[in-house]
């Protein structure tokens, strides 16, 4: 989501984010009187009453995976919502009504802050939504995002035309005006800061600990429930409620889609041998995978793929997720 700064704000704590009037901030998460936001390459907390934001009707921050399914099953194909990830603060998931069910995709971000599901990348969620209104979000079927019934769709154009004359809008939203007028009176004064500001800094929400302290890896990128169909393996899947998705990004999706048809023996000579220590337990769910426990040392035979490596342990050869291990010298 995007928001526009109504006033200048100077950070007084290390976890706060400074900005100027008119700056456009990306909103990452919500906590009482503060938002976690991003501006440029910086992230931090900003007071809600210093910015202007109106969430599009398709954004439901607190909705769970199960609630999203219940909401969308009664809708037409293509209806969707975007919600905050319950297991990964600051991330988002998109739930889409397909013909037979509701599918959930993890919205990924690259190191430049762009959002993506497949190969196309966008500077904001609104741009992503706008793109998939006219381009299929599914790689198997033609499914376009929509939040209006076919009956209402005919009235949409006129409504948007009228709105477009009233001021700037956030690209990709469904007609809701969410940017404030830039004609703010010069006599306006910044509001009082939320209480946390007078306590030196806002209290951040509980985030996941560092990877080495986790029982399970952060932003798990392995599909544990292998009954999902092939399209879900190809996209970036939601990991909420214990369901882990690939989340591999545009550079890695193709590799993951074809890796199930790759014989690990054929990969043995592709890379040099080295060693890696397991950071987490990994359960092999398919014959071509290599299971291990945290702390075990795996012989790495091929590390050319950024997401899945080939290794050997206890005389067994197979594939395993690269982010479950740490390279080591031996």
From Swiss-Prot:
GO biological-process terms attached to the record? cell-cell signaling; Ras protein signal transduction; regulation of MAPK cascade; signal transduction
Question: Could you tell me where the Basic and acidic residues compositional bias lies?
Answer: 144-164
Ranges for region Disordered: 143-244
Describe, as the record does, how this protein assembles with itself and its partners.
Interacts with phosphorylated LIME1 upon TCR activation. Interacts with phosphorylated LAT and LAX1 upon TCR activation. Interacts with SHB. Interacts with PTPN23.
Where the record annotates domain SH3, the positions are 1-56, 271-330
Any keyword Chaperone?
no
Per its UniProt entry, which superkingdom is the organism in?
A: Eukaryota
- Positions of post-translational Phosphotyrosine modification: 45
Which UniProt key words apply to this protein?
A: Acetylation, Cytoplasm, Endosome, Nucleus, Phosphoprotein, Repeat, SH2 domain, SH3 domain
Q: Which gene encodes it?
A: GRAP2
Predominant cellular place of this UniProt entry's protein:
nucleus
Q: Where is the composition biased (Low complexity)?
A: 209-222
Location comes to: Nucleus; Cytoplasm; Endosome
Give yes or no: UniProt keyword Nucleus: yes
Task: Report the GO terms under cellular component.
Answer: cytoplasm; cytosol; endosome; nucleoplasm; nucleus; plasma membrane
Pfam name, any one: SH2
Please state every residue range assigned to the domain named SH2.
58-149
Descriptive protein name: GRB2-related adapter protein 2
Modification sites for Phosphoserine: 187, 236
Q: Which SUPFAM superfamilies match?
A: SH2 domain (SSF55550), SH3-domain (SSF50044)
Functionally, this protein is described as follows: Interacts with SLP-76 to regulate NF-AT activation. Binds to tyrosine-phosphorylated shc.
By its UniProt entry, which InterPro entries does this protein fall under? GRAP2_C_SH3 (IPR035646), Grb2-like (IPR043539), SH2 (IPR000980), SH2_dom_sf (IPR036860), SH3-like_dom_sf (IPR036028), SH3_domain (IPR001452)
Q: Which residues carry this modification: Phosphothreonine?
A: 262
The family line of this record is: Belongs to the GRB2/sem-5/DRK family.
Using the record's annotations, give every residue carrying the modification N6-acetyllysine: 106
One example GO MF annotation:
phosphotyrosine residue binding
